[in-house]
């Protein structure tokens, strides 16, 4: 893993010592080279090549998320160029350095071998994200959004620390690799049920579970483009990754404790999808659609079957790329129209036809059109939940229908209709923006053709 972490850290001095006109080019090109090198390193024929270290390792669960994390840094830097045009040179450098440090923390989080180390890095990702949201957000509400984001995630994860320290004392080790070999089953007592709640709450807030999701639309709407991209694509996946890892520790209690959370997720999935149908703010709509998709992932993880885990992994990766792409498209609209209200951005298809094509593809992947990887993830989850309980098919089917409705509503509102008078003099699409869309869609296309890249050789 150091082959990824050290070059990424070295990007920070590269940015600070670059000539003013070369900052963006250097940061983008070198981060893209690092991500491509990491992809080739992670694509090893045997599992043991990266597992020599006792601190960092990669396995079938963390590798897809590591790939997504490294791939996203050049895309965030590409997307942020216009947003930071009028900023001073030092602020541009600080911004890029924060993105790079966030990437380092995320790579280390996904490859940590030990729970306490994972927890420390899990919390460390908050700091750069919070600075990015509160300093470079668009409106003054960003401070309120930052406060929500910080307090929800911190309050959720404090009980986790206490639970981890207790488990460390009782088990002797919290190493992921050792825990798989230890057969200590936890009894379903009151105290152990509370411990399960303490362990899961941090990840359920991060996912977020319906009811604990209020920080997410605020943070997404107020964050700058890179903040929205990293929040949607990776930070929500930290919750899913942590839940999958911690179910090893809490194996028998999860079956006993999962019912209320499964029902809340299934209900929340319908509710947040329905909320999307009456949104006027474009970024808010995409944020609520993220909550709806993540509810599916929570259901899959709590069911705990191999199929549901495969579905959760596939949907997390697919959603990461799709939601990031949608935020980029929303940002390209915002840069031209200076408003996130969908009614003001109508009729853009006649002015920007290529951008309308990207919107169409993004909306179709969001509603899980065959043969995309989104559909594969959703199908695996629907089948796993159906085998758990036949009644879930009603809620899942309703959710699929509403997802299609709000995706098409978003597409038709922004692209169709007669354009408003203030959109006459907007700038055409840049090559940078089109490259950004292609770099989002290329991995989605690749995964749709060959899902075994992330689902393993068993698929």
Swiss-Prot record:
InterPro entries: NADH4_N (IPR000260), NADH_Q_OxRdtase_chainM/4 (IPR010227), NADH_UbQ_OxRdtase (IPR003918), ND/Mrp_TM (IPR001750). It is a multi-pass membrane protein. The chain crosses the membrane at residues 22-42, 60-80, 92-112, 113-133, 147-167, 196-216, 224-244, 257-277, 284-303, 308-330, 351-371, 375-395, 439-459. GO terms for biological process: electron transport coupled proton transport; mitochondrial electron transport, NADH to ubiquinone; mitochondrial respiratory chain complex I assembly. Keywords: Electron transport, Membrane, Mitochondrion, Mitochondrion inner membrane, NAD, Respiratory chain, Translocase, Transmembrane, Transmembrane helix, Transport, Ubiquinone. It is found in: Mitochondrion inner membrane. It is an enzyme of class 7 (translocase). It catalyses: a ubiquinone + NADH + 5 H(+)(in) = a ubiquinol + NAD(+) + 4 H(+)(out). GO terms for molecular function: NADH dehydrogenase (ubiquinone) activity; ubiquinone binding. It holds the Pfam family Oxidored_q5_N. Belongs to the complex I subunit 4 family. Core subunit of the mitochondrial membrane respiratory chain NADH dehydrogenase (Complex I) which catalyzes electron transfer from NADH through the respiratory chain, using ubiquinone as an electron acceptor. Essential for the catalytic activity and assembly of complex I. Core subunit of respiratory chain NADH dehydrogenase (Complex I) which is composed of 45 different subunits. This is NADH-ubiquinone oxidoreductase chain 4. It comes from Oryctolagus cuniculus. The gene is MT-ND4.
């Amino acid at each position: 893993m150091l082959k990824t972490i050290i070059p990424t850290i070295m990007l920070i001095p590269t940015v600070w010592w670059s000539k003013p006109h070369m900052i963006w080019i250097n940061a983008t090109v070198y981060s893209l080279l690092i991500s491509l090198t990491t992809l080739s390193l992670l694509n090893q024929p045997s599992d043991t090549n990266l597992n020599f270290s006792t601190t960092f390792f990669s396995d079938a669960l963390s590798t897809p998320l590591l790939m997504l994390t490294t791939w996203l840094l050049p895309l965030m830097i590409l997307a942020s160029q216009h947003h930071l045009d009028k900023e001073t040179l030092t602020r541009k450098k600080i911004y890029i350095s924060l993105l790079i440090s966030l990437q380092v923390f995320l790579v280390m989080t996904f490859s940590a071998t030990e729970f306490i180390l994972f927890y420390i890095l899990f919390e460390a990702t908050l700091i750069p994200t919070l600075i990015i949201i509160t300093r470079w957000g668009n409106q003054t509400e960003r401070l309120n959004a930052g406060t929500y984001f910080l307090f929800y995630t911190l309050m959720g994860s404090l009980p986790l620390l206490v639970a981890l320290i207790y488990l460390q004392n009782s088990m002797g080790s919290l190493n992921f690799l050792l825990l798989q070999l230890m057969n200590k089953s936890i009894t379903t007592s009151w105290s152990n049920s509370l411990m399960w709640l303490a362990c899961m709450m941090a990840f359920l807030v991060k996912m977020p579970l319906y009811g604990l999701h209020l920080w997410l639309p605020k943070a997404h709407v107020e964050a700058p483009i890179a903040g929205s991209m990293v929040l949607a694509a990776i930070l929500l996946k930290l919750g899913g990754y942590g839940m999958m890892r911690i179910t090893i520790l809490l194996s028998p209690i999860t079956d006993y404790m999962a019912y209320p959370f499964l029902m809340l997720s299934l209900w929340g999935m319908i509710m947040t999808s329905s909320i999307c149908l009456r949104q006027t703010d474009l970024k808010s709509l995409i944020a609520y659609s993220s909550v709806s998709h993540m509810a599916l992932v929570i259901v899959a993880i709590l069911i705990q079957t191999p199929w549901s885990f495969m579905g959760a992994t596939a949907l997390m990766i697919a959603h990461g790329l799709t939601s990031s792409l949608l935020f980029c498209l929303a940002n390209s609209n915002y840069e031209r129209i200076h408003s996130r209200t969908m009614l003001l951005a109508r009729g853009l298809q006649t002015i920007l036809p290529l951008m309308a094509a990207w919107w169409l593809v993004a909306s179709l992947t969001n509603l899980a059109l065959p043969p995309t990887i989104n559909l594969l993830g959703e199908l695996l989850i629907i089948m796993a939940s159906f085998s758990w309980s036949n009644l879930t098919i009603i809620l899942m089917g309703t959710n699929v229908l509403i997802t299609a409705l709000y995706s098409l509503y978003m597409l038709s509102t922004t692209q169709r209709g007669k354009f408003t008078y203030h959109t006459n003099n907007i700038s055409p699409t840049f090559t940078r923006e089109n490259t950004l869309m292609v770099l989002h869609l290329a991995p989605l296309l690749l995964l749709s053709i060959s899902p075994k890249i992330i689902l393993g050789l068993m698929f």
